[in-house]
Regions:
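Conserved ABC ATPase "signature" region
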Residues: 99, 114-132, 157
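ABC ATPase nucleotide-binding domains
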Residues: 236-273
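Conserved ABC ATPase signature
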Residues: 110, 136-140, 144
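Conserved ABC transporter NBD signature motif
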Residues: 58-66, 75
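Catalytic Walker B motif of ABC-type/P-loop ATPase nucleotide-binding domains
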Residues: 161-165
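The feature captures the beta-strand-to-loop junction immediately N-terminal to the Walker
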Residues: 35-37
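Helix-to-loop junction immediately C-terminal to a conserved catalytic motif
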Residues: 50
């Protein structure tokens, strides 16, 4: 039994079905990726797993317990969320924002203790935002803000991290650093991660298993090598790609093809057929 169990999950926005009979499980310490084109239901799944939305059908259990039975405070000690965008308009410093992640662990009077500050400084160091500690959050770039929000989530010391395209605003250096950190925490601390990714190469490099979604359904589930095939990508994303093997990492590598190359390939197929 996985730490997270999703069984026949369904949800609709009015008459539009966003998630349909979705099932998967995620084990402790696993990095699990959710893939699919825009509108495939990925963000809705994360909202359901974080209880922002309530399922219309099916069941989600965490650590053997129905997700709906957790209090908000209990859930915040178990699961942290890093959304794609976070609006913080008040002039909080970076340290103050990160310390917000300690709220589920504070005593009845809500004052930070020395251990809370120690956790905050540690995760700020891990995410590379220590030097920004006294800066106000609204002064930061999009990429800097996103690393602060990740630090806030890690300050919760959750058992599971839900990530909605967490590196969308980051340059390639910081993308790799964030995923290196997430992978290390999963291996060393048993942190379970469910992440939405649009970059198929990052998914292949860092995820243990993937679920590929299409129109709210689970199209396929498995290792990156099993999921990221030409046939699957063509069927779900409706585009031509080149798939090879990265000699350095041993991982699947996906390259999109431009219009001229796609037209040439189609002409070659017609000539053969």
């Amino acid at each position: 039994m996985g730490l997270l169990e999703v069984d026949q999950l369904s949800f609709a926005y009015g008459v539009i079905e966003a998630v349909k009979d979705l099932s998967f499980s995620v084990s402790r310490g696993e990095v699990f990726g959710l893939l699919g084109p825009n509108g495939s239901g990925k963000s809705t799944v994360v909202r359901l797993l974080s209880r922002v939305l309530t399922p219309h059908g099916g069941r989600v259990s965490f650590a053997g317990r129905d997700l709906g039975t957790y209090s908000r405070e209990e859930l915040a000690r178990q699961i942290a969320v890093v959304p794609q965008e976070t609006a913080i308009e008040l002039p909080f410093s970076v340290l103050e924002v990160v310390l917000m992640g300690r709220s589920p662990h504070l005593g009845r009077f809500g004052f930070e203790r020395a251990e809370d500050l120690a956790v905050a400084h540690r995760v700020m160091e891990q995410t590379g935002v220590s030097e920004l500690a006294t800066r106000e959050i609204h002064e930061l770039s999009g990429g800097e803000r996103q690393r602060v929000i990740l630090a806030r989530a890690l300050a919760q010391q959750p058992r599971m991290l839900l990530l909605d395209e967490p590196t969308a605003f980051l340059d390639i250096k910081h993308q790799v650093e964030v995923y290196d950190l997430i992978k290390a925490l999963s291996r060393q601390n048993g942190l379970t991660v469910v992440a939405i990714l649009h970059d198929l190469n990052l998914a292949a490099l860092y995820c243990d298993r993937l679920a590929l979604l299409k129109s709210g359904h689970r199209f396929c589930l498995g290792t990156p090598e099993q999921v990221l095939t030409y046939t699957n990508i063509k069927a779900v994303y409706e585009t031509e790609v080149y798939i090879g093997l990265n000699d350095l990492t041993g991982k699947v590598h996906i390259l999109p093809l431009d219009a001229a190359t796609r037209q040439r390939l189609e002409a070659e197929r017609q000539d053969r057929g």
